[in-house]
Amino acid sequence: MNRLLSVFALGGAVLLAGCVAPTPKPNDPYYAPVLPRTPLPAAANNGSIYQAGFEQNLYSDRKAFRVGDIITITLNERTSASKNAGSQIAKTSKTDIGLTSLFGSTPNTNNPFGGGDLSLEAGYSGDRATKGDSKATQGNTLTGSITVTVAEVLPNGIIAVRGEKWLTLNTGEELVRIAGMVRADDIATDNTVPSTRVADARITYSGTGSFADASQPGWLDRFFISPLWPF
């Protein structure tokens, strides 16, 4: 019996270990800076003020429109959610069966073992009730800034950006990652854009080290709060 319990405990630990989110690592190729696909033309020294290949509209600002350009995203994320749910189910059933004859004849109800006469009557009654309540509240706030690079410019002018920032502290590392789509019109003259203007945003804030480990429950605690716990 003890051996069987040990096997179940080991199997549960393995399953819970597989459910743990992987630890983020730096230098992810997906978030690496994207370099321009074509090099800029070399400046020709021909004595002229205007050079071919270098132009800037006098009535437009110099914004990041090309692959490899840099954009600063201002993080100002605030989300809150709450949910209440309740359910109550009750059922009462009662059945009475009274028989005076069986197949057209009255059976002998004398008790051969003594005592009172036997009876063909039967009855059943039962009550069942289920009640449950749940409540969940969650809120998140993320402020700051992160500078990313232009990864792709779509034919309709939408700009795909992504990048990451790692902060190495004495107790671990802090990570901020973001990827999404930005309209060129939403980019300010200083090449900044608020995170609320980033479409299909994928924002990650995580970390490693003792502080991050302290906020994570142990494998046995995860078992008791997981759907595998039968009670």
UniProtKB/Swiss-Prot annotation:
Function summary: Assembles around the rod to form the L-ring and probably protects the motor/basal body from shearing forces during rotation.
Gene Ontology MF, one: cytoskeletal motor activity
Family per similarity comment: Belongs to the FlgH family.
Keywords assigned: Bacterial flagellum, Cell outer membrane, Lipoprotein, Membrane, Palmitate, Signal
Gene Ontology CC: one annotated term: bacterial-type flagellum basal body, distal rod, L ring
Coiled coil: none
Native source organism of the sequence: Pseudomonas putida (strain ATCC 47054 / DSM 6125 / CFBP 8728 / NCIMB 11950 / KT2440)
Matching PROSITE patterns: PROKAR_LIPOPROTEIN
Lipidation (N-palmitoyl cysteine): 19
Name of protein: Flagellar L-ring protein
Claim: Transferase is one of the keywords in the record: no
GO biological process, one term: bacterial-type flagellum-dependent cell motility
Matches recorded under Pfam families: FlgH
Bilayer topology annotation: Lipid-anchor
Assembly behavior: The basal body constitutes a major portion of the flagellar organelle and consists of four rings (L,P,S, and M) mounted on a central rod.
Lipid-modified sites (S-diacylglycerol cysteine): 19
Main location: membrane
Signal peptide: 1-18
Gene: flgH
Subcellular location: Cell outer membrane; Bacterial flagellum basal body
